[in-house]
Each structure stands twice: as C-alpha cells, then as structure tokens.
C-alpha cells in the first residue's frame, strides 16, 4: 500500500482484507474496495463529504463529457511526467473520474504505476472503487494525507480543498 497509518505514520501493509502497520493498528478494507483512514478527531464531524445523491448527480453530469477536455489535458500533463513504477495520488478524488482515466492511460502505456485516491466521502469512494478496482482508495482528508513525505511522484487535486503544507 502507498498509505501510512493515520495514528503512527508507519507504512501500512495489506493482509487479506485489511491494512496493518508495524505498531498493530488495523484498518479493514470495505467490501466495495476502499479503506477508512480518517480518524474522527481529524474532522470532529460524524458525516463527511458528499452524500450518495450528490455523488450520483455529479457522476451523471461528468459522464456527459463536459469535463473531458480538462481530463484529457490532465492526462497529457501526467504522461509528460510519467516514469516506470511511479506513484500517483489523487487528493480529493471524488468518484474517481480523473483518477481512473489517469490510471488506465498509464497502465495501457505500461508504466506500471501505483495509483491511489483519497476523499472524505465514503459514497464517492464507493463509486471510485467500482470504476477502477486496481486503484487503492481511502477515506482521508487532504489536510492529513495518509502517505509518507516525498513518496508521491504525481499529485492530482482537482476541485478539492487545497492544503499546501500537505502537498509539499
């Protein structure tokens, strides 16, 4: 996994249907394919991000192609920076519209990337995981990225909250 433990910041390793760190913290992978790495004290709220209706509405809009030119430009920029085995993180990935297409393109061109997406919305990540089963998805905040420093080669953050300190 490219993710780190949100409690101790140690690397997480996949063990069947969960991610585990050396300190013994364990995070179950949901049946739909994402893992929840958002600690309750990081937001102070019970419900996070977009609900199912909002995700469904946005997905329907995006599938009409209005943002395809932008998505294609992002992919073009990503390919310009591409290298073998690169790590890609989409911070605020939503339903995976940009993430899945970037991952698909890099895989088709045999870059063998490690791709992950985070979002604060479980509903959005359920859709993202359906769209792309090979990408790792986690419920997490852009303000507390669950990745090691300097471990990401390409960072996407499209229409998501910006946290400059986390993106350095």
Which residues does each predicted region cover?
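N-terminal auxiliary segments of SAM/dcSAM-dependent transferases
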Residues: 1-47
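Class I SAM-dependent methyltransferase Rossmann-like catalytic core
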Residues: 44, 49-73, 77
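Class I SAM-dependent methyltransferase SAM/SAH-binding core
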Residues: 87-90, 95-144
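A short acidic, Gly/Pro-enriched loop at the edge of an enzyme's catalytic core
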Residues: 143-154
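Residues lining the SAM
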Residues: 158
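A short glycine-rich, Lys/Arg-flanked "PGG" loop and its adjoining helix->strand segment in the class I
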Residues: 164-168
